[in-house]
Amino acid sequence: MTPLTTGWHPALSPRAEEGDTPPSRFDDHLAAQLLAQRIVLLGTQVDEVSANRVCAQLLLLSAEDSRTDISLYINSPGGSVTAGLAIYDTMRLIPNDVSTLAMGFAASMGQFLLSVGAAGKRFALPNARIMMHQPSAGIGGTTADIEIQAENLEFTKKAIERITAEHTGQSEETISRDGDRDRWFTAEQAKEYGMVDRVVESLDDVRPTASRRRMGL
């Protein structure tokens, strides 16, 4: 098994989605530099590949320093619930505080991961847009299969609602009602709802002093 390192590794590089421009060596260099500054960037849909990369980066940074905060920057349309929950569980597993920042677009599982950052350390840029909705899935097969899939979907929906309620201060009933259809939030509205703690415009408001020194700022 190849050990995790702070240098670039293919498993840690952003995944190009169909139709996207494939990552260049310059992109790989940027990803490595961000990782060296304890910044994890989720800039694609949430799937098994991107979740494995984010989980690996979180574990790596925690192994290097179990006390300094890690920043998770999110610009994602969402995606797989199970992949997103893997990231959430890893955030809970490590002793570090993981701050979150919405930049551009945080929808569905992107919104969920934004909301579950460390208390007091969940941020959004002024023009970020956040969208919440309930999990969905294609259901098919035999009657028995459909029943099993429906039960699993309901279980997952309840888990997401419970966790979101814990981190936003809203009730599970409110989360269920508001997520029944796509609901859009501005950065300020997300703050009022409890998804983020602050709307920020400066790096000084996001990065701890020790991290800024590491970046030479």
From Swiss-Prot:
The keyword Protease applies. PROSITE patterns: CLP_PROTEASE_HIS (PS00382). InterPro entries: ClpP, ClpP/crotonase-like_dom_sf, ClpP/TepA, ClpP_His_AS. GO terms for molecular function: ATP-dependent peptidase activity; ATPase binding; serine-type endopeptidase activity. Its main location: cytoplasm. Keywords: Cytoplasm, Hydrolase, Protease, Serine protease. CDD domains: S14_ClpP_2. The active site is at S108 (nucleophile), H133. GO terms for cellular component: cytoplasm; endopeptidase Clp complex. GO terms for biological process: protein quality control for misfolded or incompletely synthesized proteins. It catalyses: Hydrolysis of proteins to small peptides in the presence of ATP and magnesium. alpha-casein is the usual test substrate. In the absence of ATP, only oligopeptides shorter than five residues are hydrolyzed (such as succinyl-Leu-Tyr-|-NHMec, and Leu-Tyr-Leu-|-Tyr-Trp, in which cleavage of the -Tyr-|-Leu- and -Tyr-|-Trp bonds also occurs). It is an enzyme of class 3 (hydrolase). SUPFAM superfamilies: ClpP/crotonase. Fourteen ClpP subunits assemble into 2 heptameric rings which stack back to back to give a disk-like structure with a central cavity, resembling the structure of eukaryotic proteasomes. Belongs to the peptidase S14 family. Cleaves peptides in various proteins in a process that requires ATP hydrolysis. Has a chymotrypsin-like activity. Plays a major role in the degradation of misfolded proteins. This is ATP-dependent Clp protease proteolytic subunit 1. It comes from Streptomyces avermitilis (strain ATCC 31267 / DSM 46492 / JCM 5070 / NBRC 14893 / NCIMB 12804 / NRRL 8165 / MA-4680). The gene is clpP1.
